[in-house]
Amino acid sequence: FPEHNVRYIAVNDGVDTLNKSAMDITPFRNILNEMYSADVSVKIKSAYRARFQQGKFMGTTAPYGYVKDPADHNHLLIDDKVAHVVREIFDLALAGNGIAKIRKHINKQHILRPAAYAVEQGATGYERYFEDNEENRYIWSENSVRGILRSPIYAGNLAGYKRIAANMKSKKRPSKLPEEWEVIPDTHEGIVTQEEF
């Protein structure tokens, strides 16, 4: 700041770039703040891991085919309104149909895609996917079908830690392979059996 003739004042921390003695302590204060952030991060991750290992669903929105239990928002119940769609997707896959063919079959039935259904159930943040075209609400993507077929949640298992977090500062979180995911079995009723999955 000083070399650009900018004065920085932080009243709460007692920092004033014109005061040399206050500036001498600033690097140490930054180190302490960094340590505090790291400590809080570790504690939050630990609390989330403990809840996950107890079989608690931690997502904000239930996966397609499920609703959150009104008595326990960390438990999933089958959503009878759309569970038949999930079953049909698995039945078609078990009959040897590929993802593209399954997608075409579902699209012909004019079924709300998962994001549109979530919005109808009160979820927010998904509108951008189809706000420009009402018909988009009924167009399933191959990724939606693939996601359902690959998710252990549909067999009653909770899957988590699907990404690698390098450190608390990094926004990059590459995906792990499905066999590297942490899975807690039998946390809720499955829409399909373990064998079908």
Where are these predicted regions, by residue range?
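Conserved catalytic breakage-reunion loop centered on the nucleophilic residue
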Residues: F1-F197
